[in-house]
Amino acid sequence: MAVIKCKPTSPGRRHVVKVVNSDLHKGKPFAGLLAKKSKSGGRNNTGRITVRHVGGGHKQHYRLIDFKRDKDGIPAKIERLEYDPNRTAHIALVLYADGERRYILAAKGMQAGDKIQSGVEAEIKTGNAMPLRNIPVGSVVHAVEMKPGKGAQIARSAGAYVQVVARDGAYATLRLRSGEMRKVPVDCRATFGEVGNAEHMLRQLGKAGAKRWRGVRPTVRGVAMNPVDHPHGGGEGRTSGGRHPVTPWGVPTKGYKTRSNKRTDKYIVRRRNK
């Protein structure tokens, strides 16, 4: 994987930094694992904007990813690595011994031809998945479930991983990249290794148009709006906003705690680093 800085042949190319991976499949994705993906433009069923800065972008298909890794005891081979427009991580097309194909998240170091397996009898090896009760303490894992059988929810983006730091009774304690320590049931599954494509963070799009290709619309500052549109709006000439920064709905936006799910507080051993 190479990081390439483009020559400044135009203003739009001057700041472009590309991450090039020659191992990725250059053809079309596997048709049997594609699904329709409709664009909402950030609107809900009433037609009102519920998510700002969303709209446009290139047409995409959704890749059906196997986040459960529940095909136990059947060896599989990595056929190829692919680009996925729906996530920062790359994905791997897996062929099982019984002929079934599935997409999984591509782990760091994974290559075409590698052998992987799921289940308690799988060896401790990058790409293999098993319940946390069978994973040695100190192991680095990704694609971790929060509820047994629900599918992976933790550490799924490019370069992400968590570390298993303890196991006590029915729960395993994980250290997340944010510094948070969290308890997860030991029957939840995880995959060895960390998610690949960690160089994604080095990428620079270089121009506004590249953001629009990805379906991201411009962000307008509150102080540039009218009073009817934002609490920071209005005033004669340029103003500082006149108050501490808030969202368009008046909620403080700099360090204000918004977590309200007390039901799951008992699973958080230590809050994330500030």
Swiss-Prot record:
GO terms for cellular component: large ribosomal subunit. SUPFAM superfamilies: Nucleic acid-binding proteins (SSF50249), Translation proteins SH3-like domain (SSF50104). GO terms for biological process: cytoplasmic translation. Pfam families: Ribosomal_L2, Ribosomal_L2_C. Residues 223-274 are annotated as: Disordered. Keywords: Ribonucleoprotein, Ribosomal protein, RNA-binding, rRNA-binding. GO terms for molecular function: rRNA binding; structural constituent of ribosome; transferase activity. InterPro entries: NA-bd_OB-fold (IPR012340), Rib_uL2_dom2 (IPR014722), Ribosomal_uL2 (IPR002171), Ribosomal_uL2_bac/org-type (IPR005880), Ribosomal_uL2_C (IPR022669), Ribosomal_uL2_CS (IPR022671), Ribosomal_uL2_dom3 (IPR014726), Ribosomal_uL2_RNA-bd_dom (IPR022666). NCBIfam families: rplB_bact (TIGR01171). Belongs to the universal ribosomal protein uL2 family. One of the primary rRNA binding proteins. Required for association of the 30S and 50S subunits to form the 70S ribosome, for tRNA binding and peptide bond formation. It has been suggested to have peptidyltransferase activity; this is somewhat controversial. Makes several contacts with the 16S rRNA in the 70S ribosome. Part of the 50S ribosomal subunit. Forms a bridge to the 30S subunit in the 70S ribosome. This is Large ribosomal subunit protein uL2. It comes from Shewanella sp. (strain ANA-3).
